[in-house]
């Protein structure tokens, strides 16, 4: 089973999809003359990215994700500058075509924006999951050695609230 991959100035080549996604991308990268360090992906004629560069298992066969005899375009995935705060940000999906259709560019831009918003949202969720100590006004007194409450040492302890604390409260009110 083969697909057509277009690039450059209306150039195209055949690619066998009875191989791993990783091997297919290495082959496509070599055919279009990009270095191994460049991140690429394929999109169909409507501009729908296949998001192979995000795959957890690049050893999966490409024929699971691509349709035989269809045409796909090579796209370069542009990320933020290395060593900066935005190095993992998605900047653009650039089709490696001399004159890409405006509809294709719009579809790729929309997908890139959605992917970047999703990435930022996941970062915010991960930061929110970090347990932050909440100062409590509860004083814990030491009741050892038979001292009275006035003589006891007091200390403030942070109260940590987890998701389980909130769930158990809801269940009590039912």
Curated annotation (Swiss-Prot):
GO terms for molecular function: RNA polymerase II cis-regulatory region sequence-specific DNA binding. Pfam families: Il2rg. Residues 162-174 have a biased composition (Basic and acidic residues). One of its GO terms (biological process) is transcription by RNA polymerase II. Residues 138-174 are annotated as: Disordered. InterPro entries: CXorf65-like. This is Uncharacterized protein CXorf65 homolog. It comes from Bos taurus (Bovine).
